[in-house]
């Protein structure tokens, strides 16, 4: 096999895009911890940290599994429109089939799970955990869209969606501060992620070969069942 500088440059662009998006994501999420730590007692920060940590364990693991599974598969078909569409739609259905019911179950069973693991020590974290799990579902769906974008080598678009996500997160932080509660801050994260998801769907439909109605048809049944 011959060395290809064009392939190397493409790989570097994708890698740099993923790295930049990770930095942006870490910065925006740490902003919430920083602000809560300044404005609220340490006990309140502890409640938020517990809810955030346990919610991340679920959606971060799912996102990683889906990304490592579907990115190589979809990348194989980036030059074959029909096969890419079939593979993308199937990957979207698999993602929704797993992520939607898991998230729904965690939200419904949040109180029993926390009581089983911690007794009543972290009861204040339960409502925050439920909101963050709902947000986590959106993050998984956003990550799946980004996987499809990356599979086509559109690293610039991918970084663009991450910038939009982090700008909305920071904007939601400042918009929810006047409400004076950590729960309001967490709801801000949820609505920022909802807006991000709408934007990412728009970008995904533009850069891939899947139509909006096809995308919605693949996900809606699982969302409604959840």
Task: Set out the residue ranges of the language-model regions.
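Short runs within selected transmembrane alpha-helices of multi-pass transporters and secretion channels
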Residues: 1, 21, 25-29, 52, ...
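Interhelical loop/hinge segments that connect adjacent transmembrane helices in multipass membrane
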Residues: 1-30, 69-86, 206-220
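Interfacial/gating helices of multi-pass transporter permease domains
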Residues: 10-14, 18, 34-56, 85-87, ...
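Alpha-helical transmembrane segments of polytopic membrane transporters and translocases
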Residues: 17, 32-34, 46-63, 93-97, ...
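Hydrophobic/aromatic end-of-helix segments at the C-terminal termini of transmembrane alpha-helices
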Residues: 31-36, 40, 50, 66, ...
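Alpha-helical transmembrane segments and their helix-entry boundary regions
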Residues: 34, 45-46, 158-159, 185-186, ...
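Helix-loop junctions and terminal segments of transmembrane helices
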Residues: 51, 55-99, 146-151
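Alpha-helical transmembrane segments of multi-pass membrane transport and lipid-handling proteins
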Residues: 88-140, 170-178, 226
């Amino acid at each position: 096999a011959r060395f290809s500088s064009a392939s190397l440059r493409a790989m570097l662009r994708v890698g740099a895009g993923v790295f930049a998006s990770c930095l942006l994501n870490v910065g925006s999420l740490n902003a919430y911890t920083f602000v809560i730590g300044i404005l609220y007692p340490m006990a309140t920060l502890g409640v938020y940290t517990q809810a955030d940590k346990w919610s991340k364990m679920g959606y971060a693991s799912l996102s990683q599994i889906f990304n490592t599974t579907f990115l190589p598969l979809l990348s194989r078909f980036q030059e074959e429109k029909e096969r890419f569409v079939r593979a993308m739609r199937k990957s979207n259905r698999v993602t929704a089939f797993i992520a939607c019911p898991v998230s729904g179950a965690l939200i419904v069973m949040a109180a029993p799970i926390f009581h089983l693991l911690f007794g009543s020590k972290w009861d204040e974290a339960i409502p925050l955990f439920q909101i963050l799990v709902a947000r986590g579902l959106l993050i998984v769906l956003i990550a799946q869209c980004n996987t499809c974008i990356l599979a086509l080598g559109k690293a610039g678009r991918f970084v663009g969606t991450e910038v939009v996500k982090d700008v909305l997160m920071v904007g939601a932080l400042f918009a929810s501060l006047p409400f004076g509660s950590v729960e309001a801050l967490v709801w801000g994260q949820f609505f920022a992620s909802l807006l991000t998801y709408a934007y990412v769907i728009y970008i995904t439909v533009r850069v891939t070969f899947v139509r909006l109605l096809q995308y919605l048809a693949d996900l809606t049944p699982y969302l409604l069942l959840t």
